[in-house]
Swiss-Prot record:
Superkingdom classification of source: Bacteria
GO cellular component entries: cytoplasm; membrane
Assigned EC number: 2.3.1.129
One GO molecular-function entry: acyl-[acyl-carrier-protein]-UDP-N-acetylglucosamine O-acyltransferase activity
GO annotation, biological process: lipid A biosynthetic process
PROSITE patterns, sorted: HEXAPEP_TRANSFERASES
InterPro entries for the chain: Acetyltransf_C (IPR029098), Acetyltransf_C_sf (IPR037157), Hexapep (IPR001451), Hexapep_transf_CS (IPR018357), Lipid_A_LpxA (IPR010137), Trimer_LpxA-like_sf (IPR011004)
Subunit architecture: Homotrimer.
Keywords annotated in UniProt: Acyltransferase, Cytoplasm, Lipid A biosynthesis, Lipid biosynthesis, Lipid metabolism, Repeat, Transferase
Gene: lpxA
Protein name: Acyl-[acyl-carrier-protein]--UDP-N-acetylglucosamine O-acyltransferase
Listed Pfam families: Acetyltransf_11, Hexapep
Transferase in keyword set: yes
């Protein structure tokens, strides 16, 4: 049974599963689907087409599924898809996609989106990511699993943030960030790898040492990207983690943060 505050406004076409809670003065628009156990706090606005999975919690004053401000957007039907077990804190804004890209903005599972963060149109957020307060993603940004973007991080459109990477507070990212890499500054510069995060997630010391050597190959030996990738071919065959690091560099379309 859902628990809906009588002061909430819910469009008749919205679909709410069992166990959904909706707080006072929240507005749930047409085309919104909410999975079981999800809690919508007070003063939240949800606009469709938006599908929200199970056991999420969305806090007050968040705007989720609003039209994109992209000037090319002319009212086409686009969507937002949110997975399960996400926490979306106060004042977060998440926009739907555009037909010029995927027509969809996607947020995976088990993410923490902290207060006043923004996720722009057509962005793709993986699983177990953390966007700290006031982080802002422009349109078309991809953030891979377990990435952490510290407070006030700004990410340029079309950037790709690799898995297990980390940005320091106030970092301005204009190029792709390879997997595992730690970046700081405005403009962002690569400083090291997220070794502490790796240890917390149970990476073996052998894998961490291999990644340390791989980082030095790319960032400390004065090699071109092509030369560094060639040097990483052998350790990539031995360590999947190094292969992930190498692949994130090889697939970069904007160039990597150096």
């Amino acid at each position: 049974m859902s628990l809906i505050d009588p002061r909430a406004i819910i469009d008749p076409s919205a679909v709410l599963a069992d166990g959904v809670e909706v707080g006072p003065w929240s507005i749930i628009g047409a085309g919104v689907e909410i999975g079981e156990g999800t809690v919508i706090g007070p003063h939240v606005i949800l606009k469709g087409p938006t599908r929200i999975g199970k056991h999420n919690r969305i806090y007050q004053f968040s705007s989720v599924g609003e039209d994109t401000p992209d000037l090319k957007y002319k009212g086409e039907e686009t969507r937002l898809v949110i997975g399960d077990h996400n926490v979306i804190r106060e004042g977060v804004t998440i926009h739907r996609g555009t037909v010029q890209d995927r027509s969809e903005t996607t947020l995976g599972d088990h993410n923490l989106i902290m207060a006043y963060a923004h996720i722009g149109h057509d962005s793709v957020i993986g699983n177990h990511c953390i966007l700290v307060n006031n982080t802002a993603l422009a349109g078309h940004v991809h953030v891979d699993d377990w990435a952490i973007l510290s407070g006030f991080t700004l990410v340029h459109q079309y950037c790709h943030i690799g898995a297990h990477s980390f940005s320091g507070m106030g970092t301005a990212i204009g190029k792709d960030v390879p997997a595992f890499v730690t970046v700081f500054g405005n403009p962002a510069e690569a400083r090291s790898m997220n070794f502490e995060g790796m240890r917390r997630r149970g990476f073996s010391e052998d894998a961490i040492h291999a990644l340390r050597r791989a980082y030095k190959t790319v960032y400390r030996q004065g090699l071109t990207v092509e030369q560094a990738l060639a040097e990483l071919a052998e350790p990539s065959a031995q360590f999947p983690e190094v292969a992930m690091f190498r692949d994130s560099i090889q697939s970069s379309t904007r160039g990597i943060t150096r």
